Amino acid sequence: MVVDVRGLHYAVGGRPIFAGLDVQVRRGRITAIMGPSGTGKTTLLKLITAQIPADRGEVSVFGEDLAALGRRGIYALRKRLGMLFQNGALLTDLDVFENVAFPVREHTDLPEALIYKLVLTKLQAVGLRGAAGLMPGELSGGMARRVALARAIVMDPELLIYDEPFVGLDPISLGVILRLIKHMNEALGITSIVVSHDVHQLATIAHDSYLLSGGRVAAAGPPAQLRARRASDSAAVRQFMTGSEDGPVAFHYPAPDYAAQLFAAEE
Amino acid sequence: MSQRGGNDLLLEGVRRLGAVAIFLVQLLLESVPALSRPRLLVHQIYNAGARSLIIIMLSGLFVGMVLGLQAFNLLQRFGSEEALGTAAALGLLKELSPVITALLFAGRAGTALTSEIGLMRATDQLTAMEIMAVDPLRHVAAPRFLGGVVAMPLLTAIFSLIGLYGAQLIGVQLMGVDKGVFWSQMQGSVGLRDVTEGMVKSVVFGIACSLIAVHEGYHAEPTAAGVGLATTRTVVASSVITLLLDYVLTAAFL
């Protein structure tokens, strides 16, 4: 088990985000975390990467309880994982090459010639060796995400975390990112967590999936299975998997009566 | 009710002051390892210092010229125009150079620092560093803070130099004060203590303005409005603190 979340409770400003969440990520597999917007998918990633502490419950990564780790321990643990941010989060004052080289320069004393080769290898893996000299501002959204992926794998992490990797991509870039996630998992054996609400894309790559709703796991299992057993699932799961407007997640934000509000404005 | 409101305001003020003080201690602790990366530090000295040179030099020239004109006009009433060099040097070295340099620094380099760090926060760059096990306080905040602290005294010295030239330009070239008298009077009555006073002020202002700029950027709300507000706060807080500290330091040196 690479990530083990048990009985997790977390609240923001008194509003509970998670109430007894259990999620397990197995080694060498791609695990999808799905759920409608606002269910705390990104918050879960923050908890797993120790950016925020859990209120109650246990979050273990690589078998280590995050709550028991000090600052040094957390930094040591983070060296074993990579994360791909939604917007890439490339350092804007460095070019593509230096962005990918950044973690290597920070954590190792490798000679410059070796860093050069290492960075080029990773850029080649994401198809952007030719863009090494460009600045982040000159890249498209899909390219920035691929550079960020090269940076995330440059230290050969055991765990890769993708935060909404499919958002805002054209079909070609989307296909490239999907292929890369699969490749990283199959060729390099990297355990992956993919957070997304794109059910169809996830179904093509994920081995396991968790559907979050109301602060708990509403459904878990292989994505294909989740889609197949709609009838037996809760209304929330059915609505999410089918993308229906009607269901527990309402289209309208709570509001006073429509007609009454319109006529009240006239008076 | 108003008593309670006043207390809350006071508490909030003390809380913020405490937060800035803790941040300063963290910065100083991280500054030691930051010194081992001279490339980063030099880059920040260039950013805060070299890029402020034009505005500092231009302002220094004009302030010196105005000082030359006003001081000449005042001294002429008492028939002591020959003291112009002394008046200009003391005014510039002890007061005008450190204070105006700090105010210009806050407006030029301080705002750049705040908005840069604030935008790094808003675009997840600082979080990305933390996930890569790189402390952004050490890598981003400390070199920028040190860069500002080193740049301020250098800019102040340049401001003084150009200011003196400006005063000389008006006093000697335009108003006809004797060149030899202008410089010799200055040399005779300006002591090392006067220069030290200005330099100490510039170092203190450098610490205060850089600390405020980096702190505001580092803790800015990660939105467009949040970064804008933080930038404004940098200018306002730096200016007020500079003037307050100027009074305290002047009193201390008397």
Predicted regions, residues:
Chain B
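Short, membrane-interfacial amphipathic segments enriched in basic
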Residues: 1-41, 216-217, 221
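Loop-to-transmembrane-helix entry motif
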Residues: 35-38, 48-56, 91-99, 148-153, ...
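Short cytoplasmic-facing helical segments at TM-TM junctions of multi-pass membrane proteins
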Residues: 117-142, 224-227
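Active-site cofactor/substrate anionic-group-binding motifs, chiefly glycine-
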Residues: 44, 48-100, 104
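Hydrophobic alpha-helical transmembrane segments of multi-pass membrane transport proteins
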Residues: 84-127, 155, 212
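Final/C-terminal transmembrane alpha-helix of multipass membrane proteins
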Residues: 227, 233-250
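Membrane-interfacial helix-loop-helix connectors in multipass membrane proteins
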Residues: 70-93, 160-203, 207, 211-230, ...
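Start (N-cap) of specific transmembrane helices in multi-pass transporter permeases
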Residues: 44, 135-156, 230
